[in-house]
């Protein structure tokens, strides 16, 4: 062991790492284990700095190259000696052959020691040289120990015995080296004799060079020496190149680690853990958290916190004073109604007249004040000298009288101004009432659409502050007519990126510019009327955590669905059902499959069913409320004790399902008249998305997903109209049983996130909502009786801070003429092919064309969009014409007065065609057909004769027909584009021809018989490629 420790010390000394030698001894590191060191073992020995790690790495690489793998069971010393013999033999070949083997070995060993001491780590060292160094070190230590003290005889004897053992080992090594050297010389001699014998047959005279054999041998020796030198140089270069590559790799690794640590520290100190990223929801102080609060704080990296937070749209946050979010809003006000424009003009005119009247009144007041001041100055400057006392009294009385008159006039003016202000206020009130009446008269909801049992709407939130900082893209396109497209980024097998489009259609789609009042009008407000007709209504929000569910339900400054519904319920109650019904509320949550009362200090509840199989919550407290403000105060108090916490995805995540029930009860009998339930579902999240290892948060997430899965199973059972619906699988489904059974109506608001990283969650939410929508459509198809269209009372106006941004043209009933004409015009332009196989994205037309087709258009635009194919039809068929047209047709000569100038219209620009989208759809549909062909081939081959050949051939013909249809469709579009310039030239030439025909030429006059023959020869135009397909 002493020998191995000395050897290890010498190895570390070569790399200037001898200071770490005690750590190697503590860990009992031997020479063999040292050679098998890895990067992970460096820290166990205390080597942590980058430079020391590099030195140790290069030392291990050099030692591994010098000591090849052990084949026999002999000791490592013998193997190292063999390597040394090979090195020594190579060196001896380069040196003179007359020297002895011992001298050569000694010289080589000395040279190796000197080179190692000088070059450090670049030049490889042999284990024999290390042994010689060990011997020298041992002799020096023995001499120093003998000279220092004469009492340590035992230590000397031990050191002498070690020295003898080492000397014997050296002698054995030298004998082995001599034997190997003798064998090598014999081999060289045999090769030389063979070489010389082969050279004897060489014809020297035939060669052009006048060289002797001796010169040839000398050249050969020189050539062999040069080759050896080149090989050695290449080996050294390769070795240095490998070392440089290893150094660069290590530097890159450590640089990356240092950069990650620096970024982590910068993010940690930059981020304010007490503030939400949006900067619009809360402004929490930087003090320590309150120990009495129910918020659960989970430690984690700063990058993982506040990933997705609840949001506030821009149009609401600006009014509240939170202006940090700067998101562009798409204000589409191209097609405002004429009534709104007229009202705006009238208001502007009234404001202008009022400003002029105010200016005139101010000028009159200033003039009166100037007159009063002048009179006072005259009275003050009046000279009373030379007058009696009676005269002075008389003048003073007159001055006082005039002052009283002036004061009376000023008081009358003030009274008139006050009366004018009151009149203006009353006029404004009347105008507001008229506007409200007009809005109420314009308010219209088609109950065939809004009266469905299950309606599904989607709301998209804007990108938050953190997502904008990460430069994430918005992958969701909200189209008119209740459509939605998700551009999901994907990669193919060849690592080429592409975007897969998914199209969804719902009952209502709201983009990021929509506020809570607009969402309320189209989701929850139609249900308010049903609870007054002894019905039950449910509105629940579903979506990923941080997608805006709680903001939709609660809102800010009384603009959430809770507050807006409470306003309309109490307004309807006071106007129609006063002293008949009263309002009672209950507020509870479902946390971990258990019920807790939020209005009674989280008292535990139980869910049961009565004899009529109706759900009853035992122990639930109800509070009688008389105003919307009192209702909102109860909700705020309940939310304070609701279970929330911070997760890896959202810092303020709702960890429970909160349920608010607004019940209408009869005052006399105390029986239930109607019930409205608002359900704020907890955020759905996957276990792989949670970066914290808290057991409680993972358990909460599992309970949330379990309840949502049970809800999905119930919806599926109702959709399939199965006999048994598993409402008892979860507490959530038991509570929601009334929402899906009986006289009930339900609205689901699916909240989605638009960022690219949440594409999978967004698609899962949309598919979940689409499944619920299918349930509603299946039930509506089963009940084919149409609902009578009736109008419900208009809602209350929006809150003050939402009036500026409120613009909802859907409330005004739209005429059916414009929609039908646009549809026919566009269908004539873009014929639809009967698709044999729908693509995955479910898009039959390009997105741009769908947007154009869904925008309402004026009749002029509709005429401009008519295809050019319809123009010759109007000219050729017998269409009723005006007298001017008949005159032009028969070419009747006209007087100069009758000849009117023909107004030439500029040629219409042809509509732009998006060939890329057409081609992409063509390729997608073609690929689907190819997939079906491959499937049919596999089925026919695997059937082994069970499928008849005729069916297989029929399938082939169908595939070919569908391919031909796709090809013809694309060719038709290309031909239509190529014919557009020709049609434009014809349109430009028509007015010129009409001018030429208007001149009287007797040769052009036709008889009636000729005209009849010409009409009989006229034929209708041939049908185009698309006429049969439309």
Swiss-Prot record:
Induction of expression: During the developmental stage.
An example Gene Ontology molecular-function term: microtubule binding
Start and end residues of each stretch annotated as Disordered: 66-164, 178-308, 826-915, 981-1030
Residue ranges of every copy of the SAM domain listed in the record: 3-66
Top-level lineage group: Eukaryota
Gene Ontology biological-process entries: microtubule depolymerization; microtubule-based movement; mitotic spindle organization
Biased composition (Polar residues): 68-80
Entry GO terms, CC: centrosome; cytoplasm; microtubule
Chain sites annotated for binding ATP: 543-550
PROSITE patterns cross-referenced by the UniProt entry: KINESIN_MOTOR_1 (PS00411), KINESIN_MOTOR_2 (PS50067), SAM_DOMAIN (PS50105)
Primary location: cytoplasm
Domain Kinesin motor: 453-775
UniProt-listed Pfam families: Kinesin, SAM_1
Compositionally biased tracts (Low complexity): 81-117, 125-164, 181-197, 225-238, 826-839, 849-906, 981-1009
UniProt-annotated location(s): Cytoplasm, Cytoskeleton
Cross-referenced PANTHER family: KINESIN-LIKE PROTEIN, KINESIN-RELATED PROTEIN 6
Entry similarity comment: Belongs to the TRAFAC class myosin-kinesin ATPase superfamily. Kinesin family.
Function according to Swiss-Prot or TrEMBL: Microtubule-associated force-producing protein that plays a role in organelle transport. Its motor activity is directed toward the microtubule's plus end.
UniProt-recorded name of the protein: Kinesin-related protein 6
Organism: Dictyostelium discoideum (Social amoeba)
Lineage: Eukaryota, Amoebozoa, Evosea, Eumycetozoa, Dictyostelia
């Amino acid at each position: 062991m002493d020998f191995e420790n000395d050897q290890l010390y010498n190895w570390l000394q070569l790399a200037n790492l001898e200071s770490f030698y005690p750590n190697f001894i503590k860990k009992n590191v031997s020479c063999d284990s040292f050679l098998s060191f890895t990067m992970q073992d460096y820290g166990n020995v205390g080597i942590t700095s980058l430079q020391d790690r590099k030195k140790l790495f290069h030392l291990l690489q050099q030692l591994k190259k010098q000591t090849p793998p052990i084949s026999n069971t002999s000791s490592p010393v013998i193997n190292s000696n063999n390597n040394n013999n090979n090195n020594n033999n190579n060196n001896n070949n380069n040196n003179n052959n007359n020297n002895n083997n011992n001298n050569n070995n000694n010289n080589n060993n000395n040279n190796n020691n000197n080179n190692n001491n000088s070059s450090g780590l670049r030049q490889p060292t042999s284990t024999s040289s290390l042994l010689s160094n060990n011997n020298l070190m041992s002799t020096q230590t023995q001499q120093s120990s003998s000279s220092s003290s004469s009492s340590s005889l035992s230590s000397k004897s031990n050191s002498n015995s070690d020295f003898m053992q080492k000397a014997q080992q050296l002698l054995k090594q030298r004998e082995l080296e001599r034997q190997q050297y003798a064998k090598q010389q014999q081999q060289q001699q045999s090769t030389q004799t063979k070489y010389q014998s082969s050279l004897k047959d060489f014809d020297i005279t035939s060669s052009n060079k006048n060289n002797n054999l001796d010169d040839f041998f000398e050249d050969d020796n020189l050539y062999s020496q040069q080759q050896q030198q080149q090989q050695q140089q290449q080996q050294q270069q390769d070795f240095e190149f490998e070392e440089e590559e290893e150094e660069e790799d290590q530097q890159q690794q450590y640089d990356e680690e240092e950069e990650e640590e620096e970024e982590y520290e910068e993010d940690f100190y930059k981020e304010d853990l007490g503030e939400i990223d949006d900067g619009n929801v809360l402004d929490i102080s930087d003090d320590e958290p309150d120990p009495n609060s129910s918020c659960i704080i989970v430690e984690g990296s700063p990058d993982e916190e506040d990933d997705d937070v609840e949001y506030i749209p821009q149009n609401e946050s600006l009014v509240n004073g939170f202006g940090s979010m700067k998101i562009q809003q798409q204000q589409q006000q191209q097609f405002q109604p004429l009534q709104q424009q007229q009202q705006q003009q009238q208001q502007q005119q009234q404001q202008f007249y009022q400003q002029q009247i105010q200016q005139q009144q101010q000028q009159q007041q200033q003039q009166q004040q100037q007159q009063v001041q002048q009179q006072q100055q005259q009275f003050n400057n009046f000279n009373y000298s030379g007058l009696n006392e009676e005269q002075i009294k008389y003048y003073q009385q007159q001055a006082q009288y005039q002052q009283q008159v002036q004061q009376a006039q000023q008081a009358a003016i003030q009274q008139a101004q006050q009366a004018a202000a009151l009149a203006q206020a009353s006029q404004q009130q009347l105008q507001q009432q008229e506007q409200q009446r007009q809005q109420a008269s314009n308010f219209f909801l088609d109950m065939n659409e809004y009266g469905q049992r299950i309606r599904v709407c989607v709301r998209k939130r804007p990108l938050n502050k953190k997502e904008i900082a990460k430069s994430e893209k918005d992958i969701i396109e909200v189209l008119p007519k209740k459509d939605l497209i998700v551009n999901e980024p994907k990669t193919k097998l060849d690592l080429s990126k592409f975007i897969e489009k998914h199209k969804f259609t719902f009952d209502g789609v709201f983009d990021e510019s929509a506020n809570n009042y607009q969402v309320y009008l189209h989701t929850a407000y139609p249900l308010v009327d049903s609870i007054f007709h002894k019905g039950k209504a449910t509105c629940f929000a579903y979506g990923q955590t941080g997608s805006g569910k709680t903001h939709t339900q609660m809102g800010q400054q009384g603009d959430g669905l809770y507050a807006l519904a409470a306003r309309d319920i109490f307004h309807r109650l006071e106007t129609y059902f006063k002293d008949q019904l009263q309002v009672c509320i209950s507020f509870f949550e479902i946390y971990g499959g258990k019920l807790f009362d939020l209005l009674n200090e989280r008292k535990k509840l139980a869910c049961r069913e009565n004899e009529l199989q109706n759900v009853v919550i035992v122990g639930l407290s109800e509070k009688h409320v008389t105003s919307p403000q009192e209702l909102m105060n109860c909700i705020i108090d309940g939310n304070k004790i609701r279970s929330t916490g911070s997760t890896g995805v959202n810092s303020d995540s709702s960890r429970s399902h909160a349920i608010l029930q607004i019940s209408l009860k009869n005052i006399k009998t105390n029986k239930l008249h109607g019930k409205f339930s608002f359900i704020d579902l907890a955020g759905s999240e996957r276990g792989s998305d949670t970066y914290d290892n808290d057991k409680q948060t993972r358990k909460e997430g599992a309970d949330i997903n379990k309840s949502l899965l049970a809800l999905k199973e119930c919806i599926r059972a109702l959709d399939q109209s199965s006999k048994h619906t598993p409402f008892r699988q979860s507490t959530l489904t038991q509570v929601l049983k009334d929402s899906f059974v009986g006289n009930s109506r339900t609205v689901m608001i699916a909240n989605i996130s638009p960022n690219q990283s949440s594409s999978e969650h967004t698609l899962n939410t949309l598919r979940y909502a689409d499944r619920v929508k299918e349930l509603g459509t299946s039930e509506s198809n089963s009940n084919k009786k149409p609902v009578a269209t009736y109008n419900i009372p208009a809602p209350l106006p929006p809150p003050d801070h939402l009036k500026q941004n409120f613009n909802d043209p859907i409330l005004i009933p739209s005429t059916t003429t414009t929609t039908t004409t646009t549809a026919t015009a566009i269908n004539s332009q873009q014929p639809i092919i009967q698709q044999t196989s729908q693509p995955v994205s479910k898009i039959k037309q390009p997105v741009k064309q769908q947007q154009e087709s869904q925008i309402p258009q004026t009749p002029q635009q509709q005429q401009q969009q008519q295809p050019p194919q319809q123009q010759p039809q109007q000219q050729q068929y017998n269409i009723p014409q005006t007298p001017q047209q008949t005159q032009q047709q028969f070419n009747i000569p006209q007087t100069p007065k009758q000849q009117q100038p023909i107004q030439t219209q500029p040629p219409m620009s042809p509509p732009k065609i998006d060939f890329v989208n057409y081609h992409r759809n063509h390729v997608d549909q073609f690929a689907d057909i190819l997939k079906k062909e491959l499937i049919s081939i596999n089925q026919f081959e695997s059937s082994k004769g069970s499928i008849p050949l005729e069916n297989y051939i029929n399938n082939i013909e169908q595939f070919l027909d569908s391919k031909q249809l796709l090809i013809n469709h694309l060719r038709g579009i290309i031909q239509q584009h190529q014919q557009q310039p020709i049609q434009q030239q014809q349109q430009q030439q028509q007015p010129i021809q009409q001018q030429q025909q208007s001149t009287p030429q007797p040769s052009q006059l036709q008889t009636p018989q000729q005209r009849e023959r010409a009409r009989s020869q006229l034929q209708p135009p041939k049908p185009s490629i698309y006429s049969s397909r439309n």
